[in-house]
From Swiss-Prot:
Pathway: Carbohydrate degradation; L-arabinose degradation via L-ribulose; D-xylulose 5-phosphate from L-arabinose (bacterial route): step 1/3. It comes from Vibrio parahaemolyticus serotype O3:K6 (strain RIMD 2210633). This is L-arabinose isomerase. The lineage of its organism: Bacteria, Pseudomonadati, Pseudomonadota, Gammaproteobacteria, Vibrionales. InterPro entries: Ara_Isoase_C, AraA_central, AraA_N, AraA_N_sf, Fuc/Ara_isomerase_C, Fucose_isomerase_N/cen_sf, Lara_isomerase. It comes from the Bacteria. One of its GO terms (cellular component) is cytosol. Keywords: Arabinose catabolism, Carbohydrate metabolism, Isomerase, Manganese, Metal-binding.
């Protein structure tokens, strides 16, 4: 069973009647075998459905319209087995509103040198059939992914899956609702943005709800459900026995359990897969949710602190994209620096870092929260797993959205942090702190980000390409002067476009 077993990619083979029924029968058989091979690959996370060989403009238009109207279809994979005159594709492609991947492969890997004849040549024409098809994609100015290689190669499977996961992310965004509890943190700029523009570009809705509505649901959670939740905490996390033996501490734990259950119930009732809150708007709640928010993120909900709905949405989308991959995804903030031979960033937030990124079993503790609401709040404490990761920021530039991605290397802290009462990750930005921070600032990247060790750079590149949004990357190849010029060039391109 595939990871995303409720969605499909439609495989459509291009040809024409010119070649006769015998060749078309071979085309159909070869397509069946390729699809079976791709579906048998553990590297491909979405089922691929055979939608046959299209040979006329009407057949092409029909399959494109059918794809548009099928909610389970996240995109098309198109392959030209033979020559398929590309004017036949104009009507279909101009009406297609799903993304497509152009698979540039052929059925056989090697040429049968001793047997090759013109029948073989006329059957296996993807080398020039795909070029004809490629022209019309370019002529129509359609963004698409082109995967080149033999269909049995593992790298081809991985390239296909990157695109599949990007298409899944686009689909997730089109069905996402973000719930806002309270407004943005006062006077903060980068967390603002045009919600109408975001819905047009990404598909997700951003809706505000009163804290009174939320607190009513939170307060309705029964003591029995709270106690059951506390039992779960005891099984899942390291903790001091005092959390349950001390009556005051247990009361705080019960408050947090009630917040988690109430928030989850409310979010599900309004169909929201992501949410925001802010420490400046907590009327009716006992405290800023800590453990509650961390656990909701671990369940797949997106989160953005201080009203940051763009990061909340992207956190959920990337959690969906990364399903089944090693590593986790979390809301994150660049918090403080460690300047030295290798400049490092200690990332954290006041409370809300997702335990899916933890290097070891998280520890549940209660500490004083000193920003906004001053009270004791339960939270999970851990360090992030070492290894390569990404920080991703989506910003609203007025005329467009920009995605900024920094490739980073997460490392184990050289010493314990006994007095730091929050979850955290320590990383070394690529290519180094000086260039990465300067590039991030020049690009306008937010102080919040989506941190992920599950989602890859190719997935995000495909995601940005499908949506037609700007993407800039900061990694080991970044040269600051060239990066600044790229930003200038992009500004001209998107304004003229």
């Amino acid at each position: 069973m595939k990871i995303f077993n409720d969605k499909q990619v439609w495989f459509v083979t291009g040809s024409q009647h010119l070649y006769g029924p015998q060749v078309l029968e071979s085309v159909a058989q070869n397509s069946e075998e390729i699809i079976a091979g791709l579906n048998s690959s553990d590297d491909i996370s979405v089922s691929i459905a055979n939608k046959g060989t299209v040979k006329t403009p009407d057949e092409i238009l029909a399959v494109c319209r059918a794809a548009n109207n099928d909610p389970d279809c996240i995109g098309l994979m198109l392959w030209m087995h033979t020559f398929s005159p590309a004017k036949m594709w104009i009507a279909g492609l101009t009406q297609l509103n799903k993304p497509f991947l152009h698979l540039h492969t052929q059925f056989n890997a090697a040429l049968p040198w001793d047997e090759i004849d013109m029948d073989f040549m006329n059957l296996n024409q993807s080398a020039h059939g795909c070029r004809e098809f490629g022209f019309i994609g370019t002529r129509l100015n359609i963004e698409r992914k082109v995967v080149v290689g033999h269909w049995q190669e593992p790298q081809v499977h991985r390239d296909i899956d990157d695109w599949c996961r990007a298409a899944i992310g686009v689909n997730a965004g089109q069905h996402l609702k973000v719930a806002r509890f309270g407004d943005n943190m006062r006077q903060v700029a980068v967390t603002e943005g045009n919600k109408v523009s975001a819905q047009i570009q990404f598909g997700y809705e951003v809706n505000a709800y009163g804290l009174g509505e939320l607190s009513d649901v939170v307060n309705s959670i029964s003591d029995a459900d709270v106690n059951h939740q506390l039992d779960k905490y005891a099984c899942m996390y390291e903790m001091s026995p005092d959390l349950f033996n001390d009556s005051d501490l247990k009361k705080l734990m019960a408050q947090e359990a009630r917040l988690e259950l109430g928030m989850e119930s409310f979010l599900k009732s309004v169909g929201a897969g992501a949410f925001t809150n802010t420490f400046e708007n907590l009327t009716g709640l006992t405290n800023l949710p800590g453990l509650a928010t961390q656990r909701l993120m671990a369940k797949g909900f997106g989160y953005g602190g201080e009203g940051d709905w763009k990061t909340a949405a992207m956190t959920h989308i990337m959690k969906v994209m990364g399903q089944g991959k090693p590593g986790g995804t979390s809301f994150m903030e660049d918090y403080t620096y460690n300047f030295g031979e290798k400049g490092q960033v200690l990332g954290a937030h006041m409370l809300e870092v997702c335990p899916t990124i933890a290097a070891a079993k998280p520890r549940l503790e209660v500490h004083r929260h000193t920003i906004g609401c001053r009270c004791d709040i339960p939270r999970l404490i851990f360090s992030g797993q070492s290894g390569e990761a990404l920080n991703v920021s989506i910003i609203d530039l007025g005329d467009r959205f920009r995605m900024i991605v920094n490739v980073i290397d997460t490392v184990t802290p050289p010493q314990s942090l006994p007095h730091l009462p929050v979850a955290h990750a320590l990383w070394e930005p690529q290519p180094n702190l000086n260039i990465a921070a300067a590039a991030w600032i020049h690009a306008g990247g937010a102080h919040h980000a989506v941190y992920s060790q599950a989602v890859t750079l190719p997935m995000l590149a495909d995601y940005a390409e499908i949506l037609g949004i700007e993407m800039v990357v900061i990694d080991n190849s970044t040269n600051l002067r060239q990066f600044k010029q790229e930003l200038r060039n992009n500004g001209v391109y998107y304004r003229l476009g």
